[in-house]
């Protein structure tokens, strides 16, 4: 049985948009107003502030990790099922993509998804991270690296995740991330997608 409070807390944690928070801290423009308009680390990097981009990446990944780890630590005391943990994982990503604190205008979810996967299955997260790194360094296109790693996630989950509900959650997470990258997919097909760090 899903625990509604646990899912709600996870959604609220996911709703913390570190791209906006970090940018505001450094006196930068709201990342939703320049570049791709996406409040994520890649777009923050376009501002030229590498430290802000790194902090955004770490913050977005950490919130996914913390939301799911918190639920796993409290799983027995709260009587949370494995399916409830899967729902918590999804809620963190949904919060990032449609954050209640920022007008439901969120990011594409790559870093948060990685944090969620790290909490569910470190091996799955490691596979995805390695694929992202290879693709990013090889092609210098963030979205291509993200899409490749995203597609690999459910396949890796089949081998490394212990619960079927978590595998299904990983598949849904991958589909959500792919959905949020639909404009990037279109640009890739047209050969118009920008390189990492390139200003628009």
Curated annotation (Swiss-Prot):
Entry keyword Lipid metabolism: yes
GO cellular component, one term: plasma membrane
Keywords for this protein: Cell inner membrane, Cell membrane, Lipid biosynthesis, Lipid metabolism, Membrane, Phospholipid biosynthesis, Phospholipid metabolism, Transferase, Transmembrane, Transmembrane helix
Listed SMART domains: G3P_acyltransf
InterPro entries given in the database record: G3P_acylTferase_PlsY
Subcellular location: Cell inner membrane
GO MF annotations in UniProt: acyl-phosphate glycerol-3-phosphate acyltransferase activity
Pathways involved: Lipid metabolism; phospholipid metabolism
Membrane-crossing residue ranges in chain numbering: 2-22, 51-71, 84-104, 114-134, 159-179
EC number: 2.3.1.275
Catalytic activity, reaction form: an acyl phosphate + sn-glycerol 3-phosphate = a 1-acyl-sn-glycero-3-phosphate + phosphate
One annotated GO biological process: phospholipid biosynthetic process
Function: Catalyzes the transfer of an acyl group from acyl-phosphate (acyl-PO(4)) to glycerol-3-phosphate (G3P) to form lysophosphatidic acid (LPA). This enzyme utilizes acyl-phosphate as fatty acyl donor, but not acyl-CoA or acyl-ACP.
Family: Belongs to the PlsY family.
NCBIfam families: glycerol-3-phosphate 1-O-acyltransferase PlsY
Description of how the protein assembles with itself and partners: Probably interacts with PlsX.
PANTHER family: GLYCEROL-3-PHOSPHATE ACYLTRANSFERASE-RELATED (PTHR30309:SF0), INNER MEMBRANE PROTEIN YGIH (PTHR30309)
Protein name as catalogued: Glycerol-3-phosphate acyltransferase
Organism: Neisseria meningitidis serogroup C / serotype 2a (strain ATCC 700532 / DSM 15464 / FAM18)
Gene: plsY
